[in-house]
Amino acid sequence: MKVKIRKHLKQQLSSLTDKDVLEKSAKIAIKLLKYSDTYKNKNCLIYKSSKNEVLIDSIEDNLISNGNSVFIPKIIDGNSLCFNRLDSNQKLILNKFNILESPSTELIEVSGLDLIILPIVGTDKSGFRLGHGGGYYDRSLEAIFNFKNKPLIIGIGLDFQYTNKNFGEPHDTKLDLMITDKRVIDF
């Protein structure tokens, strides 16, 4: 079922124009700023947008201007992620999926994160995230669900990426919120 849903949602995403993505990203950013603005001097994980993903440059700027340490994922050991500090003056590097990564050696353990903002391909009605199918975030974030002080996990995507189905599996990352261009969904 996940393969079929992922394929359908990716087809919808690929039909978007750059203008569509830009306009819808701006609407999401306005909603997301309400949450990110409450984080000051914290450790925040974001992502660098790839094709047809919500653009979050304004959120990144807001988090940094509020004194937060911002981290982005980097692929290690072929199938896991580490989280490298993002510095505004560093040159980022494209990985094998054409996603920008930080060359920084300053890492943070997942236990040190306060806010996590994730891209999604889709989300089910219980808040389980559907990604591109590699399981990178699922493997790298699985420990946080055992933490006493779990970080807030926000998935951002377009409204059609929310599905009224249940496809979540025990290993899938569960979101606390999904922010779309039309609404905020609290799981």
Identify the residue ranges that each predicted region occupies.
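Surface-exposed, charge/polar-rich loops and edge strands
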Residues: 4, 11, 111-116, 125-128, ...
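Glycine-rich, N-terminal phosphate-binding loop of Rossmann-like dinucleotide-binding domains
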Residues: 48, 120, 182
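N-terminal active-site beta-alpha-beta segment that forms phosphate/nucleotide-binding
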Residues: 1-112
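A structured binding-face within diverse protein domains that lines the active/interaction site
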Residues: 102, 119-121
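Short, well-ordered strand-loop elements centered on a beta-strand within folded domains, enriched
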Residues: 78-84, 128-130, 153
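Short glycine-rich anion-binding loops that position phosphate/pyrophosphate groups of nucleotides
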Residues: 50-52, 121-125
